[in-house]
Amino acid sequence: LDETQATLLNAGRYHASHGLLRIELRHQLRDSGHGVREDLLEAVLTVRNASDRPQRVEIGFGTSLRPGGAGGAQQVYLPLSAAGLFGDGRFAALGVRGFLKDCNQPVAAGEFACHYLEPMASQPAERETRALLLAPVVDVFDSRQPWRVALFTPSDEPARFSAVTRTPLFGGPGGADKAGQTTWRASRCVTVAAGSAHTQRCWLLLHEGDAAVAWRAFQQFAHREEFDVPGWVREMKVHYYDFLSSAEGGEGRRGDGYEGDLPRFREFRVGLATQHGYYPAIGDFIQPDRKTWQAMRGDKRGAAAMSFGKMRARIQATRAAGAKAAIYMHAALFDDAAPCFDRLRECVQVDASGQRMDFGWTGPDTAGKTWRASLGSAEWRAHLLQQAGWIMDILRPDAIVMDETFAGLGYDHHAGRTGPTSAGAIDFYRRLRALVRSFGADKAFFTSDCSMSPFVLWADGECGDHAYPGLLGQALYTQAPVRYLAALGGKPWRPCAWHFQQMWPAQMKLARQVGAGVGVSNGWLEYTGLTRLPAETKAAMLADIQTLFDARG
């Protein structure tokens, strides 16, 4: 808003009117639990609309508090999406080519802006950002000073954070201060319905230490955890992922690789085993009346026969081997060879030019062309929830692993649902977790954010495949404090890794650094599985895996 249209409130002026809007600001000091009493200030702004029509309002919280005083060199540590590390084209609509990579950024004269969730979700006129955040937290510091200032907002609401620095024409006393005044602001636009009210919160934290301190405060005060993470999820360290592999390796016919690796589960201390590639067409994973089917219909060696019986037998054998069993789903991939595609074709996401968005995946599990379905579509969300319900009811696994959950970030230009998709995605992941948990308190739902989105906030942990040179292989990916921990919090990180041998040193580095697990796999990119590993490689891996359990003890 133009400053002439703004209504400013502070500790001395805590209520006001703006036309037919009634505005009230309340502050409360809190103890974040980090050893400094009353180090957290919570601000609550309530806007009441007394008019007879909806009102669009921009709500912002600002502070000129800065570490190090007016003459300090200000920096900010941001939990940036890792999509910028390799320019992931799936984030093109958000401006991925210009994404910042280093979480540590200087704050210079002018405006520095960053966004949590899609920019348009907090500021309707903005489409792209240079800094896409994994959590709505900015941590401001001066490297010469111990104290930091952090701003954060609720986990399920979009936010735009900005710093405006104005350099004065003249310095301070003696000409020493020419750094100018910096104001940090957290804001978003909301529509307040006629006769209703909207409440917005923001927190200001003073702390020592690094940004991880602010992230923990965010998790404690600005995020509501709806379920406890099952104990077994924290205990397991090794995640096995099977892409309906072959027991004969890369040149064999798919379908029996899982059974070939099962006898090695105890030896490798596998704690979770995920079945992937089992479906006839991605997006149409399971149907109650389809008890047998052909999977991997795009594989050059021929399709693989699958059935409920085979999947259940794998689940039982996995448990007998001391592991938990998970079933794969995907948040957005939709194969137009699926019988349900014609009924659900309007669920496909539409880009800014009005074209349906293809996902660009062609693999052994595809029978037709793959499209990007939209989590902004209520019909698609209902379809996936129904699929998940059938999986849990018919197969009775211990968990569902949802692939590429970051597909929930973006814009859908389909008529009738135009706008950001993250609100629908958050609602969907919340409902999916609740559905899975309805089958037992020990059932779990895992995301695959791959450090590119924040949806693990509404899951039991992260199982995404990040074992690529462009992600896990980048030094900035594990820059301390590791960016994804802002969203992950204290939940388990148990990745998938198709490049599990190639990326093993990087996997172990992260595991030792932050307590993550490691991934082993079969059926994609590497085809040895657990059974055909070279003896020297196997021995080294087993020794490394043992250290993960030794460290835990």
Where are these regions (language model features)?
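An acidic-aromatic substrate-binding cleft motif
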Residues: R201, L205-Q287, K291
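Active-site-adjacent "subsite" loops/lids of carbohydrate-active enzymes
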Residues: Y240, L244, G249-R254, A304, ...
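Active-site groove signature of glycoside hydrolases
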Residues: G271-Y279, H383-T418
